[in-house]
Amino acid sequence: MNYPSVSEQKHRVFIIYSAYLRVQFRESARLAVSVRNKNYNLVRADLHNILPQKNTTVFKDGTLAPLLIRLAWHSCATYDKYTRTGGSNGATMRYHLEASDEGNVGLEVARLSLEPIKRKHPWITYADLWILAGVVSIEACKGPSIKWRDGRVDYEDDLLVPPNGRLPLGGGDASHVRTIFSRMGFNDQETVALIGAHSLGRLHHHRSGFDGPWTSNPAKCDNEFYKLLLGNVWTLVDSPTGRKQYVNSTGQVMMPSDMSLIEDANFRFWVDQYAVSEELWRDHFALAFEKLTELGR
């Protein structure tokens, strides 16, 4: 058998490597042009386009918005002000350690839904895209406009993934809620305002263990969550998975952590305020959510 000479082998390697460099150069040039031409308004438009969902078996309320808000929320809520770790930077939920946190079950659907937009606009980081998706979703559900700025980076490995257990748990009491939110840097007023996002979406037993909608219109961002907390008789029942949850006569549900907002005097003060004034809640929620998106930067 005749083997190629050393010079022939080198020539073949050179040809292959040259072809590889040409491909890399074209890709780098494409990305460079893309970055120069980056347009967040186009990304926003594409995000709006993916929100309506015809498959009401999977998306009972006909929209992807609540799930994208949850993705944005949870990607920020790992922040620890004491160690200055976690938060919206890094898009660390791409890695198994964070993706496997019990609080993030089901969010792979949200992440995968954003992949076509990421491929279309490769210049935007995952970290920025996830947060922008949440902001756009709030606005699409008639919620307040949220100030948003870019500049988040994607971590190249999982070395800076925050530990599991930092997300709020639905079965927690007022002490748990206050501990989790104060660790992120929120006071009681901001905490209650942020939890008002439970006006959107619904609980799924295969994700959280709880089941049912919080409000009568899970696709509308308003202050109904607070009104329902105060204006209903809530009965403690078992969810399909055996977790304790509260239900009213019309089928809305609350988790123990939700009910803690009217059991704790300091939290209750703000529930009362927001139930009366949607405008006040919208103003406070917009500021608190903006603060949430900036954690860890």
From Swiss-Prot:
<keyword id="KW-0479">Metal-binding</keyword>
<dbReference type="InterPro" id="IPR002207">
    <property type="entry name" value="Peroxidase_I"/>
</dbReference>
<feature type="active site" description="Proton acceptor">
    <location>
        <position position="74"/>
    </location>
</feature>
<dbReference type="GO" id="GO:0046872">
    <property type="term" value="F:metal ion binding"/>
</dbReference>
<dbReference type="GO" id="GO:0034599">
    <property type="term" value="P:cellular response to oxidative stress"/>
</dbReference>
<feature type="binding site" description="axial binding residue">
    <location>
        <position position="198"/>
    </location>
    <ligand>
        <name>heme b</name>
    </ligand>
</feature>
<protein>
    <recommendedName>
        <fullName>Putative heme-binding peroxidase</fullName>
        <ecNumber>1.11.1.-</ecNumber>
    </recommendedName>
</protein>
<comment type="function">
    <text>Destroys radicals which are normally produced within the cells and which are toxic to biological systems.</text>
</comment>
<keyword id="KW-0575">Peroxidase</keyword>
<keyword id="KW-0408">Iron</keyword>
<feature type="site" description="Transition state stabilizer">
    <location>
        <position position="70"/>
    </location>
</feature>
<keyword id="KW-0349">Heme</keyword>
<dbReference type="InterPro" id="IPR019794">
    <property type="entry name" value="Peroxidases_AS"/>
</dbReference>
<dbReference type="InterPro" id="IPR044831">
    <property type="entry name" value="Ccp1-like"/>
</dbReference>
<dbReference type="Pfam" id="PF00141">
    <property type="entry name" value="peroxidase"/>
</dbReference>
<feature type="active site" description="Tryptophan radical intermediate">
    <location>
        <position position="214"/>
    </location>
</feature>
<dbReference type="InterPro" id="IPR019793">
    <property type="entry name" value="Peroxidases_heam-ligand_BS"/>
</dbReference>
<dbReference type="GO" id="GO:0020037">
    <property type="term" value="F:heme binding"/>
</dbReference>
<dbReference type="GO" id="GO:0042744">
    <property type="term" value="P:hydrogen peroxide catabolic process"/>
</dbReference>
<dbReference type="InterPro" id="IPR010255">
    <property type="entry name" value="Haem_peroxidase_sf"/>
</dbReference>
<keyword id="KW-0560">Oxidoreductase</keyword>
<dbReference type="GO" id="GO:0000302">
    <property type="term" value="P:response to reactive oxygen species"/>
</dbReference>
<dbReference type="InterPro" id="IPR002016">
    <property type="entry name" value="Haem_peroxidase"/>
</dbReference>
<comment type="similarity">
    <text>Belongs to the peroxidase family. Cytochrome c peroxidase subfamily.</text>
</comment>
<dbReference type="GO" id="GO:0004601">
    <property type="term" value="F:peroxidase activity"/>
</dbReference>
